[in-house]
Amino acid sequence: MSNVKYIFSHLDQYGKLGIPLNISEITLPSHAELGDGEEFQRAAAEMLYRIWFSHPATEAIVWWNMVDDTAYVQADSFNGQQGENYYKGGLLRRDFSEKPSWKVLEHLVNHEWRTAGTLDYDAEKINTFRGFYGSYDIEIRTDAGTFHTTLECRKKVPHQFTIDLNKLN
């Protein structure tokens, strides 16, 4: 079984509990001992986020340390004075410059996994669109003017909306 199938099968098992999965406290290393550690971190982050995001039971994914070298270090740390900082697991370097993992996750979240588009209304049929869960700012332009509303698409909630322009200001 490939690693992807193995991870997904574990998510399936946890998903059977019927509670939302929160993937938290992620630390993917980028230290120099990995060769091009930042490329390793980028590739691992992209693969894992795609798996986690695609699973229906996943509700949240939380990266642990945003910036390298800022994790709390206990005096009796397992690897001297560095503690978790040894792994360089942040999405940003110590100087706040973006690492490749930041760039790939920013692209996934703000571009690939974002729904945007235009729908031309057809009075003769049910008008539909396909998008990710979340909030949608809707702008409707008619001969009578432009109207705005917000629609919420959430898991386990019916997603059929009727928009009455007479009730919008």
Report residues per predicted region.
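Aromatic-rich peripheral "rim/lid" segments of glycoside hydrolase catalytic domains that contact
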Residues: 2-22, 28-169
